[in-house]
């Protein structure tokens, strides 16, 4: 229903317009207060790059963060990552991730980024506190913030927006009548717009999510996902249909697709109940970090990597590395 409202297919979005105007006025006032200096943003002693969205829902932001961290690491840059930690609740904040940190404490995306990149990661509702925690513990040269485009209390040097190339901006309205956290005109002020799938427009960077080999949660064994039989697909991400479509494009045809809420807590019994006799469970890598502790032998995940094309990605990376002292 939400997807139909936000796309404009359902006329119910009109009933929500008063709330959208209120959302837009409040969010606009907050941004303006920082722009005019009525509120002061905290500036870190190292450059800060924000990777965020203009819309609610999954746009492929986390793969972009992982891509950016890995690209900078290959260039010899010491990178730290901060996040709000959605879906997690720590005993105390800021929380610096360790190999023992669980998704219940830090959220699924920070744990995934930490495991994939090995970069220092910290989570806190106040992102400045997370930045300070990393700087106190690690000699990093730059901070990447996972989400937080609208978190203006943290000053930033580079802003990158990730856009779903198929859904774009829906009906274009603010939440809750539409998907927008900020209006599309905000693109004029960011440093880069990365478009996940669909067709990139002038000035935008095209991106595709490239699937790798399926990985067994228990053994780490790898195989072509099309070789797995009787698949039940599970996706607890912002836009589950994208994952199911990826499986189809790989030649894997799930018998059943189970969409879950983004950042949803997964209980062992609930996940186990999805798979019947002789079936194979295939999930996203983000779900896998929540399920690995209680995984069964027939549970697999399909990792994806961001693939950016054209000359603009290299220019963006050159611009970012030029900020590092």
Curated annotation (Swiss-Prot):
Enzyme nomenclature, EC number: 2.7.1.130
GO terms, molecular function: ATP binding; tetraacyldisaccharide 4'-kinase activity
Main enzyme class: transferase
Any GO BP annotation: lipopolysaccharide core region biosynthetic process
Binding site for ATP: 55-62
The keyword ATP-binding is assigned to this record: yes
GO cellular component: plasma membrane
Catalytic activity line of the entry: a lipid A disaccharide + ATP = a lipid IVA + ADP + H(+)
InterPro entries hit by this protein: LpxK, P-loop_NTPase
Transmembrane segments: none
Keywords: ATP-binding, Kinase, Lipid A biosynthesis, Lipid biosynthesis, Lipid metabolism, Nucleotide-binding, Transferase
PANTHER family: TETRAACYLDISACCHARIDE 4'-KINASE, TETRAACYLDISACCHARIDE 4'-KINASE, MITOCHONDRIAL-RELATED
Summary of the function given for this chain in its UniProt record: Transfers the gamma-phosphate of ATP to the 4'-position of a tetraacyldisaccharide 1-phosphate intermediate (termed DS-1-P) to form tetraacyldisaccharide 1,4'-bis-phosphate (lipid IVA).
NCBIfam families per record: lpxK (TIGR00682)
Designated name of the protein: Tetraacyldisaccharide 4'-kinase
Primary gene name: lpxK
């Amino acid at each position: 229903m939400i997807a139909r409202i936000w796309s404009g297919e359902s006329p119910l979005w009109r009933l929500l317009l008063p709330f959208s105007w209120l959302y837009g006025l409040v969010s606009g006032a907050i941004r303006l207060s920082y722009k005019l200096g009525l509120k002061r943003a905290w500036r870190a002693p190292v450059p800060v790059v924000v990777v965020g969205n203009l819309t609610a829902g999954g746009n492929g932001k986390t793969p972009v963060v992982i891509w950016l961290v890995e690209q900078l690491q290959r260039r010899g840059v010491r990178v730290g990552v901060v996040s709000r930690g959605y879906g997690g609740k720590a005993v105390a904040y800021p929380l610096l991730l360790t190999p023992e940190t669980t998704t219940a404490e830090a959220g699924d995306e920070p744990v995934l980024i930490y495991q994939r990149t090995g970069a220092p990661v910290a989570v806190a509702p106040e992102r400045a506190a997370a930045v300070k925690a990393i700087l106190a513990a690690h000699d990093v040269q730059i901070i990447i913030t996972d989400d937080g485009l609208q978190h203006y209390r943290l000053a930033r040097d580079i802003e990158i927006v990730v856009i779903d190339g198929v859904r774009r901006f829906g009906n274009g309205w603010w939440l809750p009548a539409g998907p927008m956290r900020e209006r599309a005109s905000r693109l004029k002020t960011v440093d880069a717009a990365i478009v996940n799938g669909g067709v990139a427009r002038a000035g935008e960077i095209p991106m595709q999510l490239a699937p790798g080999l399926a990985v067994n949660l228990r053994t780490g064994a790898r195989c072509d996902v099309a070789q797995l039989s009787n698949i039940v697909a599970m996706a607890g991400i912002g836009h589950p249909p994208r994952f199911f479509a990826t499986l189809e494009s790989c030649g894997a045809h799930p018998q059943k697709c189970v969409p879950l809420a983004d950042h949803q807590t997964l209980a062992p019994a609930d996940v186990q109940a999805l798979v019947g006799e002789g079936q194979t469970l295939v999930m996203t890598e983000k779900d896998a970090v929540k399920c690995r502790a209680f995984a069964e032998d027939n549970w697999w995940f399909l990792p994806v990597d961001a693939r950016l094309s054209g000359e603009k990605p290299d220019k963006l990376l050159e611009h970012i590395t030029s900020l590092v002292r």
